[in-house]
Amino acid sequence: MNITIFGATGRVGSRILDEAVARGHRVTAVTRSGTSADSVDSVTWIAGDARRHRDVRRLSRGQDVVISATSGPRTGGDELAITARALLVGVAETLARLIVVGGAGPLIVPDSDGRLVVDDPRFVPESIRGVAEACVDQLDVLRENSTVDWTYFSPSAELTAGRRTRRFRTGTDQLIVDSDGTSRISLEDVAVAVMDEAEQPRHLRAVLTAGYSQLVQRPRVVGPANLRRAEVTS
């Protein structure tokens, strides 16, 4: 496939780039400067800005998928929403699919009667609430569009550099948590999940999430009948 990646040198974007190259795709890697220290035959580095719809249109022509892994300021604001609008306008004419990598803020907390992650201090401390709210606005912009084939990737609450395990669970609009209540995934497995969706789209105009989830092992309940059976066979 031909893929354009905005934010290709960021924490997430650089790993998506590596994953795409490893899978044999041709990548147009977009940064503000258009330069990178890496040199790979299947990657073309070019300058561009995802906030400018003309740049998005120019860099999505002839591409199968456009992936945006740009970030916004920790204080929040409207930059992510502005970028989402520019991306939608830019790919509308080229018919490329759009995958936007956002944050966990818009996801629903399990067993919470619809409470969003952005409103749960267990996952979003006050110091990053601004950017979490910006991610909610970012998704709202996408949801208003019914013509572009977009996917919003909303990761687990905790993102860390780690290993590429490919052992994670995917879902839609609900936060994935482990048996101890944590929500986490490695940046490397985020790249795997995003590229899986790029290759085999299953979440068109929808949210995709991914995270580690170990099922709680429930103790076996031994009833009177089982006890009698055990006594007979012992």
Language-model-detected regions and their locations in the chain:
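N-terminal Rossmann NAD(P)H-binding glycine-rich loop of SDR-like oxidoreductase domains
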Residues: 3-23
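NAD(P)H-binding glycine-rich loop region in Rossmannoid oxidoreductase-like domains
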Residues: 4, 34-94
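Conserved Rossmann-fold NAD(P)-dependent oxidoreductase catalytic core, especially the SDR/UDP-sugar
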Residues: 26, 34, 85-130, 136, ...
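Short, polar loop motifs at secondary-structure junctions
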Residues: 29-36, 156-157
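Glycine/proline-rich active-site loop of Rossmann-fold NAD(P)-dependent oxidoreductases
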Residues: 112, 145-147, 160-167, 197-206
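Substrate-positioning beta->alpha
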Residues: 134, 182-195, 206
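Conserved beta-loop-beta element that borders a ligand/cofactor-binding pocket
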Residues: 139-161
